[in-house]
Amino acid sequence: MSEKHPGPLVVEGKLTDAERMKLESNYLRGTIAEDLNDGLTGGFKGDNFLLIRFHGMYQQDDRDIRAERAEQKLEPRHAMLLRCRLPGGVITTKQWQAIDKFAGENTIYGSIRLTNRQTFQFHGILKKNVKPVHQMLHSVGLDALATANDMNRNVLCTSNPYESQLHAEAYEWAKKISEHLLPRTRAYAEIWLDQEKVATTDEEPILGQTYLPRKFKTTVVIPPQNDIDLHANDMNFVAIAENGKLVGFNLLVGGGLSIEHGNKKTYARTASEFGYLPLEHTLAVAEAVVTTQRDWGNRTDRKNAKTKYTLERVGVETFKAEVERRAGIKFEPSRPYEFTGRGDRIGWVKGIDDNWHLTLFIENGRILDYPGRPLKTGLLEIAKIHKGDFRITANQNLIIAGVPESEKAKIEKIAKESGLMNAVTPQRENSMACVSFPTCPLAMAEAERFLPSFIDNIDNLMVKHGVSDEHIVMRVTGCPNGCGRAMLAEVGLVGKAPGRYNLHLGGNRIGTRIPRMYKENITEPEILASLDELIGRWAKEREAGEGFGDFTVRAGIIRPVLDPARDLWD
């Protein structure tokens, strides 16, 4: 993250095919509407396969049965993933009841998947149900616009802060930023909601006709919680409060975790501090960061197109000066803040307004009725009686927010009867995985289906070494794109091949340091053997309050990553 070797502001060369597709799409319409009526295939063809991502969907198939279907000369069982736009993760109980019904009646898997980007996904939507899902969302005030592809994705906001008033203010800014950076094209409304075509020319004053060079992620974070993992994101607004009231933000730009195995031109990167801005400049600054990345981001190589690479190429100070010029402001020096953790506080927490918040641990965010644990039914029953709202956290958990004292017992009874309040270890509470197999086309190794039994084994090691009341931030991601945020964990597993992972160590508990690869392409028994030895050493040799990741660095087990653009692969 230095100013060495600043490169050109704009990368010249042959544009990627994605740029052609966006330019020719007529502001994201393509021929999606016509494709919907093609019953010969369960999928979308040509450019539409990628264009539907701008409308919040990915085309997938069930990889567990892919080979079997190929033998039967059948096409893969195509189905869509849909990701809702839900700034800050807040969803009403009426909206919850609607999504519960749709998941149960109209998806292959019948589940609601909470994600670590504070929203929910439906997996397994057949083509005939694609239009109905958008119409269902619209009927309850939701949409899936811009939750995938080259736009500003779902805006995150710290979900369970210590001060409810501060959360309310920060959440409003998350919503404002999300709305301000949305695409202006009417394609979504025309295709999915049957709204009339208006005889005006589409314009995209912020995103431009070819949108952004690559995905773009934004957060609003309230210290001391770093639950949203700001360093995984392109643009981050750190809330600065005086006397409990929000007065402005520190801006950090250029975080991101995605890498490619063996490609040393790719790297995870923590975000760079730009400085402090008063509240009234928030939207202008957000727009300036996005338009600078729009104009300077690399459109000739998608693997080098994210904001983190733009910052490294042009230099942090050059990018920052351009943001100041476009926004018409000068950043003040960053105000002090600190992070103390990023896990959710599971169980009841009292807010300052005498209401209570109940955070429920949802392993891997997968809401389904399991034998003896009817999680989905339990949450539906709570949604029917709860007067407040639900909040999805960036740790894939769910908060029943704003519960009056008089309603606590009733809600707790349902939660306990449904298995939503079963006791779990601190280690399980602080472990996370992406979806991976069977639905993700990029998956190289299991993640969500691997994690529960893997954590059983880790729990046994924690007991063996006398540290079962503590935790290590542990994450599994099925491929190096990094949706499981393993590259900000104390122990990160990155899928390499079926049953094999790269083991990364040396991140820290608060998520401000990238971990380094410790062992490559190893199996679960090999991972457990390494961690058995290292957890044993941590238990015996650590200093007071020292987290596992900090210990591995101090003990010389792993070298810290100091400047990931230059030393991640050393």
UniProtKB/Swiss-Prot annotation:
Binding, siroheme: C483
Enzyme class at the top of the EC tree: oxidoreductase
GO biological process, alphabetically ordered: cysteine biosynthetic process; hydrogen sulfide biosynthetic process; sulfate assimilation
GO terms for cellular component: sulfite reductase complex (NADPH)
GO molecular-function terms, A-Z: 4 iron, 4 sulfur cluster binding; heme binding; metal ion binding; NADP binding; sulfite reductase (ferredoxin) activity; sulfite reductase (NADPH) activity
Cofactor(s) needed by this chain: siroheme; [4Fe-4S] cluster
Keyword Amino-acid biosynthesis annotated: yes
EC number: 1.8.1.2
Keyword field: 4Fe-4S, Amino-acid biosynthesis, Cysteine biosynthesis, Heme, Iron, Iron-sulfur, Metal-binding, NADP, Oxidoreductase
InterPro entries membership: CysI (IPR011786), NiRdtase/SiRdtase_haem-b_fer (IPR005117), Nit/Sulf_reduc_fer-like_dom_sf (IPR036136), NO2/SO3_Rdtase_4Fe4S_dom (IPR006067), NO2/SO3_Rdtase_4Fe4S_prot (IPR045169), NO2/SO3_Rdtase_4Fe4S_sf (IPR045854), NO2/SO3_Rdtase_FeS/sirohaem_BS (IPR006066)
PROSITE patterns: NIR_SIR
Name the record gives this protein: Sulfite reductase [NADPH] hemoprotein beta-component
Gene expressing this chain: cysI
